[in-house]
Structures are given as C-alpha cells and as structure tokens.
Amino acid sequence: MGTDGAGHVARSTIRPYSETLNVTRDGAPMRTFLHTADGVAIDSVYEPGGVVYDSGKVVYERVGEGARNGSGNALSGVSQGLVFVIAHGFTGDADRPHVRRVARVFARYGAVVTFSFRGHGRSGGRSTVGDREVLDLAAAVAWARELGHTRVVTVGFSMGGSVVLRHAALDAGGVDAVVSVSAPARWFYRGTAPMRRLHWLVTRPSGRLVGRYGLRTRIHHRQWDPVPLSPVEAVPRIAPTPLLVVHGDQDTYFPLDHPRMLADAAGEHGELWVEHGMGHAENAAPEPLLRRIGDWAVARAG
C-alpha cells in the first residue's frame, strides 16, 4: 500500500504537538504525538517503570523547544535502562484494554512505550497493514532513546509482530531484543477463515467502511507497491539481536507452520515458544506468559 514501500528505516523526527503534549516532571506518564519519517502523527504514551497509565487522569502541559524538536530530554532524571516498545495488532490502539494490560505487566520490568499505529486510534494517516507501520515503530523507538533509555526491547503482536521483525532487520542495531507474538511468516495468507475475512476488510471498499466505522481503523485503499520484505525474509537479518517468537497452538489466524518458519529462519539466534491453549495476539496472551516474556527480555537485554 502506498506508492513506495518502507524499504528502509529512516530516523524519524520527534516533533510532539506542544498543545497536546502530556508531560509531567515527577516521573509520571506522558502522552504526545510523534512525527514519522513520512510525516504521520503517531499517538504515543510513555510510562516509567512501575507507573500505570490512566487516560482519565492525564495532565497536559507545554514543554520547552528541546522536547518539541527532539533535541533535548523532555524529562529531568528519566531512568537510564530498559524500555519495552509495544506494537499492537491490527484494529488495536494504545488505549485498548488488552494493550493496557500488556503495558501494566511489562511496567514491572522497565519503562513502557505504547502507541497507536497509523490509521488506528488517535493517530493520523491510514493503515497500510504492516508496510509503512515500520516507520511508526521507528518513531517510537527513537523517542524511547531520546528519553534516555539505553536498552530497547520491541514486542509486537500479530501485525505488530511482523512490524517488529522488519524494523529490526532494516534498522540494524536499533534495538537490543525483539519479541514477535502471533505473527505471520509470509504475506497474503488466506488459509483460515479469519484471514479471509481480514483480506475482504482490507481489499474491498465495503470492507474498509466496516473497518472505519465498525472497528475504528482507517485502511488505505492502495495495494502494496512494492511488496515489503516478508517476516520470514526479515528474520535472518536480525542476528545477532536476540529474537523470541511466541505463538499459540490455538491461533485461528495463523497455524503453527508460520512460527516454525520464522524459527527455522532465525537459526541459533532465535527461540520459539509454542503456548498450549493460547489463541491469537495480545487479546489471548495470559499474564503468566507476559511475565515470562518480561523475564526473557531482562535476561537478554536488561
């Protein structure tokens, strides 16, 4: 989708809109809009470790020029350490209950950045279903670095799981560990009923209307041109960055040949966890699994 694929990851400019920037200087969460390399505004939330974000209790402040243009730290005394950048699945957003649940668990292990992909939630633009979303993730990772974090772990679910793989492959050295949950290995898969419905949603005008008004997801009408690097093609390029692939054996979207293809492509630098009884993506990820992922991330990148 779009006239050119996100074939590389440019360093995104961090330009919060000052009138909507939520930042407090006492270690509380903050919320802002980031600008991607192609100019899309991405709604993003930062939570210091151990702090739970509550969208009903935010404080909006203006900040100095350094924070607006990405040339200075928006907070004084931000902890130098591990941060999780969470990439949600298709039709999710930063305020969805399951995304917030994931963030709460990972906040026990480090700081957390959540954001809404383009076309989702409060973010601008239209969804390209995993293509240019790599630029959205790049902006969020750059923001985490700007805030002073020295170790970044990206955790993606479903569409977000494919995005974290491509981002790590295209931006060598940009992250310290990668976790991909419920991701496809290859594009254009239609082997399950949910994926056939998703393709109708994305490719048909009536489907995109359902996406906009029923699922709060604005989907781009253009097809991919060129087709982006597939997840299974991206995985070998991630090494030596540690990679964890997680998949449920009850996933109704992508059967187990997908994670096994990813694990085979990863070789010795990747790990595969097949979770008994788990369905698809963040909605199905139980808290004990999320804690195990947190432990894994700390051991590899912390």
Where are these regions (language model features)?
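Conserved alpha/beta-hydrolase
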Residues: 103-124
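N-terminal cap/lid segment of alpha/beta-hydrolase-fold proteins
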Residues: 4-68, 72-77
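Hydrolase active-site cap/lid region
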Residues: 173-224
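Catalytic histidine-centered segment of alpha/beta-hydrolase-like enzymes
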Residues: 278-289
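The serine-hydrolase catalytic nucleophile loop
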Residues: 90-103
